[in-house]
């Protein structure tokens, strides 16, 4: 009887498999990839870093957890090139790859000295994905890209990162890099490899961006939208919000909105998951409130919320130099300056129910263009790691300015050039002369 039962059980299991299917045991052997430069993250900083390193001749691998590059522009949907130009004169202060991307998106001339807005927008975030894809493909043979790939572990020896472990459709993959550039936004590689960092117990709120179609353009739309959200909040349908920014950016009857405010810890998986769900809930609550109370939305429909909620702040490495508010506001100059910033100190309050988008008075915290030194991209304790983007070394106040789109691109380009220079000269990034990095950037227009 037992044998018959086992036979029937096996037969039933076999019948559940498609014709010709076989059971496969996963191989224990990992795929191993050796590369000169590993760029972790394909957002604004990471895309610029990967392009800069590969264009400078280094064999480069960029890994990104999304199925496309562009980070806050494409995954979060923020189309602004914040930090590219002086707020009053509109003079372009960041050139290099950032200006190249803006020009190739059709927003300005490639040799622009001044632009119409200090924070111009690109016309189409999907086409920005295509632009990055095309630029990556132009570096074929020098640049490999792995999308849908998560960094999940690091191995260090004698102050060097020797291996980085990825998880993707190949299983667990071991990467053996000579230089690593952490552009993860959250300093994941730096933190897991043991580099010192800091993270405030309460960070800036997370924001989901979304779009609504078939909206009538009326002069009082922003005022009415704000009044409707007050009613929704009073009814318990919307916990926090700011603004909101209701902007006709992409089409004459379509609005793009950022006004959601979700307090959360973006380096805690469970809390980040909660924030993603809360953001979607809040976006639809806003839409319902406007449909109910604002005539311009009578025939409107919800187009989409972008895939990821936007993160403003998480870990910041403690580097060889910690860039401070005073450095920015005093316009302090550095011999090893490798990037320029010009955005105001933009610190969003975490838990206020309504109100403005900044804990600072922007009139009092608008610096002139300022230097970002190479040392603020260098973490302590690890010789072959560079960090670029919003997780670089800065105080919380300075980071409120340096975290934005174009400043991240400028840091990423500098890190990519530095990584290639380190490979070429056989010198660890930690031992590179920052002035040499600056000279190398000048040669490529960065």
Regions found by a protein language model. Give the residues of each.
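Bacterial Sec-dependent signal peptides at the C-terminal "C-region" and cleavage site
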Residues: 16-30
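Aromatic pocket-lining residues of Rossmann-like dinucleotide-binding sites
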Residues: 53
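N-terminal secretory signal peptides and thylakoid transit peptides that target proteins
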Residues: 1-15
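Conserved N-terminal/central alpha/beta ligand/cofactor-binding core
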Residues: 58-59, 64-153, 207
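N-terminal Rossmann-fold NAD(P) dinucleotide-binding loop
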Residues: 46
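Beta1/beta-strand and adjacent pyrophosphate-binding region of the FAD-binding site
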Residues: 32-43
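Flavin (FAD/FMN)-binding glycine-rich loop and adjacent Rossmann-like elements that form
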Residues: 72, 147-148, 167, 172-179, ...
């Amino acid at each position: 009887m037992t044998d018959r039962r086992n036979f029937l059980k096996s037969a039933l299991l076999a019948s559940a498999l498609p014709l010709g299917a076989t059971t496969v045991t996963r191989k224990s052997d990992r795929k191993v990839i050796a590369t000169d430069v590993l760029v972790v993250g394909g957002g604004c900083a990471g895309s610029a870093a990967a392009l800069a390193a590969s264009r400078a001749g280094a064999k480069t691998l960029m890994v990104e957890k999304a199925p496309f590059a562009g980070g806050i522009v494409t995954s979060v949907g923020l189309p602004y090139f914040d930090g590219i130009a002086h707020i009053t004169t509109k003079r372009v202060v960041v050139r290099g790859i950032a200006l190249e991307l803006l020009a190739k998106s059709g927003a300005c001339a490639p040799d622009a000295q001044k632009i119409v807005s200090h924070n111009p927008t690109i016309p189409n975030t999907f086409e920005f994905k295509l632009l990055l894809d095309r630029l990556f493909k132009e570096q074929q043979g020098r640049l490999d890209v792995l999308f849908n790939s998560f960094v999940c572990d690091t191995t260090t020896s004698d102050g060097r990162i020797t291996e980085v472990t990825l998880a993707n459709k190949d299983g667990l993959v071991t990467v053996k890099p000579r230089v690593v550039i952490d552009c993860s936004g959250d300093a994941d590689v730096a933190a897991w490899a043991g580099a010192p960092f800091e993270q405030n117990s309460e960070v800036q709120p997370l924001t989901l961006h979304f779009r609504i179609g078939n909206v009538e353009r009326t002069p009082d739309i922003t005022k009415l939208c704000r009044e409707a959200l007050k009613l929704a909040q009073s009814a318990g349908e919307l916990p926090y919000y700011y603004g909101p920014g209701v902007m006709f950016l992409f089409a004459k009857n379509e609005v793009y909105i950022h006004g959601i405010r979700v307090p959360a810890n973006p380096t805690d998986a469970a809390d980040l998951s909660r924030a993603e769900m809360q953001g979607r809930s809040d976006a639809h609550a806003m839409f319902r409130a406007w449909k109910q109370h604002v005539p311009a939305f009578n025939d409107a429909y919800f187009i989409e919320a972008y895939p990821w909620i936007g993160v403003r702040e998480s870990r910041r490495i403690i580097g060889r130099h910690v860039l401070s508010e005073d450095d920015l506001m005093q316009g302090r100059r550095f011999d090893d300056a490798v990037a320029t910033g010009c955005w105001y100190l933009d610190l969003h309050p975490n838990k206020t129910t309504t109100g403005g988008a900044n804990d600072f008075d922007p009139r009092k915290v608008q610096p002139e263009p300022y230097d970002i030194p190479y040392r603020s991209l260098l973490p302590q304790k690890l010789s072959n790691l560079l960090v670029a983007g919003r997780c670089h070394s800065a105080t919380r106040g300075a980071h409120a300015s340096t975290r934005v789109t174009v400043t991240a691109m400028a840091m990423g380009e500098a890190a990519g050039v530095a990584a290639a220079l380190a490979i070429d000269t056989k010198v660890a990034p930690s031992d590179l002369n920052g002035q040499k990095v600056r000279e190398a950037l000048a040669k490529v227009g960065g």
